[in-house]
């Protein structure tokens, strides 16, 4: 199974990055060691399934959930009260943690970035977030957001540390093609790739009841993002 996984990764990388397959194959079985060490940090948020970016020596954490993955029987699956509505900045060197509420942002942006299992990719000073599963108030339901949000990473980090308003550092656009959750997004040479994932609308039911619809993408989307209008616009 391990070799199949590695070969699958090699194939995907060879598609996305021409010329990488040979060098990857030469090194994928080289011996290596991996050490994981826990570092205690006061104030570190207990969240999962969030998007993140890095600027200089600080981390930016957006979205995700504050509860574990349990209690999935409707109407208790994915309670909205456990969506992470704070945005965090972490300095791993000093151990400092800052946060600010996302509730002051416009509704469209706020609801999108507080979803979970979004796809995200950082390009220079901007973090791009697509899709994600969460509560949408206009339709009064849990769904996969057909949206893309651009985040000005250094400006947001500075605003959170200084406890200043976040307005003006986020821009959100609606695009049905971005209605994906649980996939992966990368950017290579100014082209973004949205890999796999699915669209899940409704409340989860472990018995496959009628409370949701689900469609797997089974695809890799490639596109560029045009920011010239002030909004992130997708061109495929």
Language-model features: locations:
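Beta-propeller blade signature
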Residues: 76-95, 142-159, 207-231
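Bacterial Sec-dependent N-terminal signal peptides
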Residues: 1-31
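Surface-exposed loop and turn segments in beta-propeller and other repeat-based domains
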Residues: 37-40, 94-111, 155-176, 233-236
């Amino acid at each position: 199974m391990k070799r199949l996984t590695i070969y699958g990764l090699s194939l995907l990388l060879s598609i996305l990055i021409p010329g990488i397959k040979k060098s990857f194959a030469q090194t994928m079985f080289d011996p290596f060691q991996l050490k994981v060490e826990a570092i205690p940090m006061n104030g570190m948020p207990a969240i999962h399934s969030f998007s993140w970016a890095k600027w200089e020596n600080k981390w930016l954490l957006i979205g995700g959930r504050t509860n574990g993955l349990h209690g999935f029987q409707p109407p208790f699956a994915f309670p909205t009260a456990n969506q992470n509505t704070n945005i965090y900045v972490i300095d791993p060197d000093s151990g400092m943690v800052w946060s600010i509420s996302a509730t002051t942002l416009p509704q469209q942006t706020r609801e999108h970035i507080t979803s979970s299992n979004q796809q995200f990719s950082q390009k220079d000073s901007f973090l791009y977030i697509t899709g994600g599963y969460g509560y949408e108030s206009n339709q009064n339901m849990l769904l996969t957001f057909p949206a893309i949000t651009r985040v000005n990473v250094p400006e947001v980090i500075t605003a959170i540390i200084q406890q200043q308003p976040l307005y003006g550092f986020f821009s959100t656009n609606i695009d049905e093609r971005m209605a994906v959750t649980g996939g992966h997004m990368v950017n290579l040479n100014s082209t973004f790739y949205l890999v796999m994932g699915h669209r899940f609308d409704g409340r989860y039911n472990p018995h496959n009841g009628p409370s949701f619809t689900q469609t797997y993408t089974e695809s890799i989307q490639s596109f560029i993002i045009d920011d010239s209008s002030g909004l992130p616009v997708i061109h495929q």
